[in-house]
Amino acid sequence: MPADEMLIRQLKQSDYPALVELIRRTWYAQQADGNTDGLEPTCDARHRNTLAWHLAAIDAYDCLARTTYAAVVERNGRIIGVILGSVPAKVTRMQILRHRWQQASLALPMLANRAGRNGLREQLAILHADRALIQTTGNDYQAEIVLFLVSPEAKGQGVGGRLFAHMLDRFHALGIRQYFLFTDTTCDYGFYEHKGLQRAGVRNLALAHGEQLQCFLYQGRVNDKER
């Protein structure tokens, strides 16, 4: 593969550390750390035993627990984008249990300190907001885009557009016509509106230190203009 050429391929288990690191850089880079000595370290020694990394890993396993297809963009041997999709009918019980066990093994030691408890509490609040959004719509969607991330240095280079189109092609091949995704004000949700998705729900969430977060549910149809 020529230098600087982008390759879209399926996510492999060996990519999980890179997935966690991308989540950490996107949402937890400013996370204040507590003492997490003794927890399993990241492959990146600079962030070893950090609260931010463990919260990111918990997020990753939460997403993987319901993912049925995942793809990454690789350039020069480095993952610069990832997208996870789910067709609920294809999610297995063993898959859910395997990833929930990983989540629990990461979360339990974090209960021993205040920073860890606060981080977990915030994650749960967002998950509850997402569940409330899906219940409010009353729709039984065929598929979900579970996670969609592009590394900061790769934004504006067409990486996100290619990844998004790749997932929609996958949905199309499976006969999926309608899908949804969760997003919030920490994300570039304007991308989804540009792709033709419609906002189907919004929920306001109060976080620590008086911060406010708006959580959204967007829905789209395969074969509409977002493809």
Regions found by a protein language model. Name each.
Residues 7-21, 30-34, 87:
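A short beta-loop-alpha structural element at the N-terminal edge
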Residues 72, 78-87, 128, 132, ...:
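Conserved beta-strand in the GNAT
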Residues 146-148, 152-155, 180-190, 205-209:
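Conserved beta-strand-loop-alpha-helix junction that forms the acyl-donor binding cleft
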Residues 89-143, 208-211:
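Conserved acyl-donor/pantetheine-binding loop and adjacent beta-alpha core of acyl/acetyltransferases
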Residues 27-70, 75-76, 132-134:
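Active-site rim helix/loop that mediates acceptor-substrate recognition in acyltransferases
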